[in-house]
Amino acid sequence: MSAIDSQLPSSSGQDRPTDEVDRILSPGKLIILGLQHVLVMYAGAVAVPLMIGDRLGLSKEAIAMLISSDLFCCGIVTLLQCIGIGRFMGIRLPVIMSVTFAAVTPMIAIGMNPDIGLLGIFGATIAAGFITTLLAPLIGRLMPLFPPLVTGVVITSIGLSIIQVGIDWAAGGKGNPQYGNPVYLGISFAVLIFILLITRYAKGFMSNVAVLLGIVFGFLLSWMMNEVNLSGLHDASWFAIVTPMSFGMPIFDPVSILTMTAVLIIVFIESMGMFLALGEIVGRKLSSHDIIRGLRVDGVGTMIGGTFNSFPHTSFSQNVGLVSVTRVHSRWVCISSGIILILFGMVPKMAVLVASIPQFVLGGAGLVMFGMVLATGIRILSRCNYTTNRYNLYIVAISLGVGMTPTLSHDFFSKLPAVLQPLLHSGIMLATLSAVVLNVFFNGYQHHADLVKESVSDKDLKVRTVRMWLLMRKLKKNEHGE
């Protein structure tokens, strides 16, 4: 195997552009850039409580409480991930945390059980978050299984998976009876063109907020065309306190806990891919300790979610694309986003206003952002060796093919057991598992481990230094005729 296929991310303490990731911008820029991140993730963040509330037949007031709790928890967990707590948790990268779609189907199944209902979802969420927090070190130590070849496959599969979200947004959003309406497509295309023009001709900070300006432009255009629905804005309150266990004491059902834990382990693997993608974008090499700290926040954030009437949390892939587009790598921007999310959770009127942004407006921006994630994965794969190691072609081809299966054929796995559905319907998870297994099969695991030891050992460096000193001494003697 070539060297580039076997290099592993080194320790997080060296060779990292801390001036970019840790740089604190001016308050005005932090607010604007933070709001840009919030607008990108907002539709996905509120979709989960809306879906669960609708399927469980909850009242409008109960669903509104779920949304407020969800936004509040997204903000808290984002702050934990970006700021961190000592050496225990927090990857300290520009990450936005939000509820995961992977757990929606199991949560609905749990909630439909009349014996436990919504309280059973909260109980399973809290318990599964606690269990996976304990498992984070074990999962994080799988880093040797993710050389650049596998990392490239994972990031490419993330891009391929989420770009479908952008396409659905551009057409009006899934479930919209007017899906594909030419007006939606036209506005989405106009937003895309507007973002490209800002990116091409604007300079400095204006270029960095091209996505935000595009969303504002699309919102105004939609409003002038009577395509903005502001219903509920007048009735929404200005302030609401998010309290823990507002629906009652959680119910801890063993079967539900096991189901949710299995789903969260899958989410953890996807989170590793998100972290690796973000590390590649910001130019920061991640160690297994970085990954473990990030995964711990996933687990602790899930516990917080269950306690405060919300659901499992994970890093949001849409915002990874935004970091790539804006080239603003400061984690303090996402810290600003976390504060804004907390405020939105406590100010329902603002939350309703942001929720009124049509999905087709976000679609134009989504095509740019999600395509950038895909391009990052392709860039990593382009650096791998396919000339002397033909096995790498098989690994990439098969892994991406398997990963695209649930996206291209929704019914492909429909006849298989229901317990496997969360795994089989995650294209990212399928691509990741395929790439890891195939890479170990073709290229071996022990070979990677040996290279890791060499990369962190300075024994060879000392030997080479002594040899170089002896050579220089010999050359000087020859010059003086000694």
Swiss-Prot record:
Cytoplasmic side: 1-29, 84-92, 137-142, 200-204, 283-337, 381-392, 443-482
Effect of residue 37 to N: Strong decrease in activity
Top-level lineage group: Bacteria
Membrane topology recorded in Swiss-Prot or TrEMBL: Multi-pass membrane protein
Residue intervals annotated with topology Periplasmic: 51-62, 114-115, 164-178, 226-261, 359, 414-421
Compartment(s) where it occurs, according to its Swiss-Prot or TrEMBL record: Cell inner membrane
Record GO biological process: proton transmembrane transport; urate transport; xanthine transport
GO MF terms held by the record: symporter activity; urate transmembrane transporter activity; xanthine transmembrane transporter activity
Impact after mutating residue 318 to E/N: Strong decrease in activity
Effect the entry attributes to changing residue 100 to S: Decrease in activity
TM helices/strands, residue ranges: 30-50, 63-83, 93-113, 116-136, 143-163, 179-199, 205-225, 262-282, 338-358, 360-380, 393-413, 422-442
Effect of residue 298 to N: Lack of activity
Pfam families, per the entry: Xan_ur_permease
Activity regulation behaviour: Inhibited in the presence of the protonophore carbonyl cyanide m-chlorophenyl hydrazone.
Keywords associated with the record: Cell inner membrane, Cell membrane, Hydrogen ion transport, Ion transport, Membrane, Symport, Transmembrane, Transmembrane helix, Transport
Cellular component annotations (GO), alphabetically ordered: plasma membrane
Record note on what altering residue 256 to Q does: Almost no change in activity
Function recorded in the entry: Proton-dependent high-capacity transporter for uric acid. Also shows a low capacity for transport of xanthine at 37 degrees Celsius but not at 25 degrees Celsius.
Protein family membership: Belongs to the nucleobase:cation symporter-2 (NCS2) (TC 2.A.40) family.
Protein name as annotated: Uric acid transporter UacT
Species in which this protein is naturally found: Escherichia coli (strain K12)
